[in-house]
């Protein structure tokens, strides 16, 4: 039902005005569709094998009110309609904002931007990121009259007004498996741009293609591979597994894991072929790594894939290039005011607005065991970003320790609802300190040690006799060199 306060406001409006009459109709229509949402009923119907009516999916915060009523069997979108014309305009602005930021800070154009291309870009944002990729390399979509993509067109250098920026794309497994046409379109565009008769200082795609060709006996196709993912049938970037297992000592260890897991090429005539050497070569030319946020409903702490892929790619590019590689984050939450900021600034923004926000913490505590576990997972991802990129400020770890470990009220909440979550939080903080990723004050160090011993006592007192398998926590540092199976599997990657 419509909120009572809103009803009172509506009573004061002159509904005889035609403009307000139309708005009223829209409000009442939205309210009716919200009331018609039957999610639980649809779930039960599905369990019983009944028909569930179909409906579109999307973010209502992006104006997609057609997703109402919910509880329908939702479908995605026509993959041959992305990027849409409106998304292309947003993508163009994103590309120019990224280039402008790098020019202002580094006094030069970025030659190669490594992009984590997520399915949310296509399914929620109609291909803004895809459009950004196209504009960076200097091409634009060509549409049929019905809005479907016909092909791409080359933007002349004179019209573009700058060099063509190279891209290295780690595409998500969902895009790979559900939107192969989008991958093939970008791949064809990259090959076309690499073959243009243009000066190398104006076409970084061509420049890097020739460099790779010189190391691959003149193989043009090897030189133009820019889209990579994990092995067919697999997902995730691998880096997060190494981080969570503490299976690394230095940045190079995470770089090797990322390279091994993600060195499989995808494109028009190549699908899932192992191309680790070519992947390593193109990563050497990366100047910037990049991802973007499209909605506050999801952020870079929402899944380990964010730091595993974007963070892993940053670690790999820095290790292989032996140079400073910037990490940027785009923001299209407000499509009218797109931004590109440092990854460190995006981390600060999300930490302040969610993780350390008292209102957010209060709302999570309402969910008891699950809420405690979710807090622990997000803190683990903060650690993951620091492990892979070193872009997390010390004050963030300080405040996490003070808020969740040293605060008596919150500590009691974890003790009563999920002491394992507090054990994980404390252990990750201790690991960050021991690895030199964070330099806490002495009082914080002392408190962490004390609380960790308390947690061990809680768990020993309450866990009882364990007769089956049991997973405990520890900080054991194990790398590929120490596990014979891993060592054998990654032998070729280690040589790169």
Question: Positions of the model-derived regions?
Answer:
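Ligand/cofactor-recognition surfaces for anionic moieties
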Residues: 1-496
